[in-house]
Amino acid sequence: MSFPCKFVASFLLIFNVSSKGAVSKEIRNALETWGALGQDIDLDIPSFQMSDDIDDIRWEKTSDKKKIAQFRKEKETFEEKDAYKLFKNGTLKIKHLKIHDQDSYKVSIYDTKGKNVLEKTFDLKIQERVSEPKISWTCINTTLTCEVMNGTDPELNLYQDGKHVKLSQRVITHKWTTSLSAKFKCTAGNKVSKESRMETVSCPEKGLDIYLIIGICGGGSLLMVFVALLVFYITKRKKQRSRRNDEELEIRAHRVATEERGRKPHQIPASTPQNPAASQHPPPPPGHRSQAPSHRPLPPGHRVQHQPQKRPPAPSGTQVHQQKGPPLPRPRVQPKPPQGAAENSLSPSSN
């Protein structure tokens, strides 16, 4: 490599090292500042007092060298996007901190002669506030748990009766054996917030745990509800079965009554022949000649002789009861002539 090339390379290397040293020195001299996410923060300039000799105060982000606020005498104050506010004493307010606001901020102050009288860098870091810790315990194995749900890089500390017993980040589990009753304090904190909670734990020497008692009571209640539902179901089934039986009996009785009502018209003619006299026609009045149907009247002599042969024998009661099925048609019975008419008909023959 030629001498001019070596000289240029050495110059660039020296310049690069010196610039890195300046940046490192600037970050090392920066004032570390912590801000809470979603909150406002004021960047106060230490060891600075505003005077009439100050002409220019300028704030910028060191990451992109971008001006975000500026105060100049007899000129309007510049503030970017309403996210910043610059006070007359040089303090910069950053509103509603967000994650991307985490950066380094540099302030430069000049007097009326243009001389740089002060430069200061702030290294802003943002964290989420911690939530209040929660304490829970069980008396069966004398174990206590403390935990924090929210917060950036939380730090938990547990104290028993004022004595520090444990340190952790998110969850602390502690088993105590000194006594059955104790006072516990759990604190959670980070760079921007701190929360604490205190509980007095008292466990009985002998007896059931509260959770066991609740479980037994709950199980007993469920058992009682189940038994009540079972009794109600059985009672309802019995009522339904009884109602169904009653309906079946009623339907059966109605059917039997309907069948008996249908048989009655066929049984009435069969029972009437038991009283033959009631079924005969009423005797005709005296002097009336009875005639057989579809026959001409015969002479008196023949009428007396053939009249007894045309009377059919009356059916007996036993025959009526032995008959089964529908009743058979009966022959028409010829009415018996009155006694006076018979004597009148016989008198000419006797003469």
Swiss-Prot record:
It holds the Pfam family V-set. Residues 129-209 form the Ig-like C2-type domain. Residues 1-24 form the signal peptide. GO terms for biological process: cell-cell adhesion; natural killer cell activation; natural killer cell mediated cytotoxicity; positive regulation of type II interferon production. Residues 236-351 are cytoplasmic. Residues 326-338 have a biased composition (Pro residues). The chain crosses the membrane at residues 210-235. Residues 106-120 are annotated as: CD58 binding region 2. CDD domains: TM_EGFR-like. The keyword Disulfide bond applies. Residues 61-75 are annotated as: CD58 binding region 1. Residues 243-262 have a biased composition (Basic and acidic residues). One of its GO terms (cellular component) is cell surface. Residues 241-351 are annotated as: Disordered. This is T-cell surface antigen CD2. It comes from Macaca fascicularis (Crab-eating macaque). The lineage of its organism: Eukaryota, Metazoa, Chordata, Craniata, Vertebrata. The gene is CD2.
